[in-house]
């Protein structure tokens, strides 16, 4: 890969990270996890979106999204999930972003074209209230990254921001609900919902994934 291709790949990664920060905020708003007054309307990519008012919430989302950048640039990120849990730490709903970036094609796309494509995801999210399920009482949520290989602790400051989680995993295949997909060069992106199947047992197993440190 040439230096120019590497720079272009970095631009794609930064655009994707900025988008992820906005999309995660919209998902949390969509779920009604916090009162609507905890958010304020802003415009991003010419779409009306939500921005967290509370500094700690805003910083957590920003840190989770921006912390993905070095791993996205290295092609390590396979999926990013916004996971909602019951009080027993059992996942009840996952918003999954499946990511593939083709660095060799990054120089072929203009930033405006990429933003236009990502804009359609934000528009779709804003009208997806009917797809989500009500949250249980005393629930919580987190951002989880599924990596193709785990970074070694101490290998970089970025790696230290992420820790393996003890999140329980469904044993049966989940119920999938597609939301939006993009299949282009250099970015392929899928957004879909996962819910546990009706036959899901109560005893769940732990996966190989990582989550950012709590703020």
From Swiss-Prot:
Family, according to the entry, reads as follows: Belongs to the MAD2 family.
HORMA domain location is: 10-193
Compartments, record wording: Nucleus
Keywords annotated in UniProt:
DNA damage, DNA repair, Nucleus
- Recorded protein name is DNA polymerase zeta processivity subunit
Subunit (UniProt): Forms DNA polymerase zeta with REV3.
Instruction: State its role.
Output: Regulatory subunit of the error prone DNA polymerase zeta. Involved in damage-tolerance mechanisms through translesion DNA synthesis.
Q: What is the lineage of its organism?
A: Eukaryota, Viridiplantae, Streptophyta, Embryophyta, Tracheophyta
Listed GO biological process terms: DNA damage response; DNA repair; response to UV-B
Gene3D superfamilies, per database record = HORMA domain
Coarse class of the protein's main subcellular location:
nucleus
Task: Tell me which domain of life the UniProt entry assigns to the organism this sequence originates from.
Answer: Eukaryota
Keyword Ubl conjugation recorded: no
Task: Kindly give the InterPro entries that the UniProt entry links to this protein.
Answer: HORMA_dom, HORMA_dom_sf, Mad2-like
Mind naming one GO cellular-component term on file for this protein? Answer: nucleus
Do the record's keywords include Nucleus? Answer: yes
């Amino acid at each position: 890969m040439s230096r120019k291709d590497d720079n272009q790949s970095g631009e794609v990664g930064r655009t994707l990270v900025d988008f992820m920060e906005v999309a995660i905020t919209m998902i949390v708003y969509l779920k009604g996890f916090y009162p609507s007054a905890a958010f304020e309307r802003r415009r991003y990519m010419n779409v009306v979106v939500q921005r967290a008012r509370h500094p700690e919430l805003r910083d957590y989302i920003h840190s989770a999204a921006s912390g993905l950048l070095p791993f996205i640039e290295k092609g390590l990120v396979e999926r990013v999930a916004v996971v909602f849990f019951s009080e027993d730490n059992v996942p009840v709903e996952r918003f999954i972003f499946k990511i593939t970036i083709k660095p060799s094609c990054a120089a072929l796309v203009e930033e405006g074209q990429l933003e236009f494509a990502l804009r359609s995801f934000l528009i779709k999210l804003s009208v997806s209230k009917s797809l989500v399920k009500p949250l249980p009482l005393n629930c919580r949520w987190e951002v989880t990254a599924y990596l193709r290989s785990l970074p070694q602790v101490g290998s970089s400051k970025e790696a230290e921001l992420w820790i393996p989680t003890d999140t329980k995993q469904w044993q049966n295949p989940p119920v999938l609900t597609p939301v939006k997909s993009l299949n282009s060069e250099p970015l392929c992106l899928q957004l879909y919902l996962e819910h546990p199947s009706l036959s899901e047992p109560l005893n769940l197993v732990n996966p190989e994934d990582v989550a950012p440190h709590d703020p």
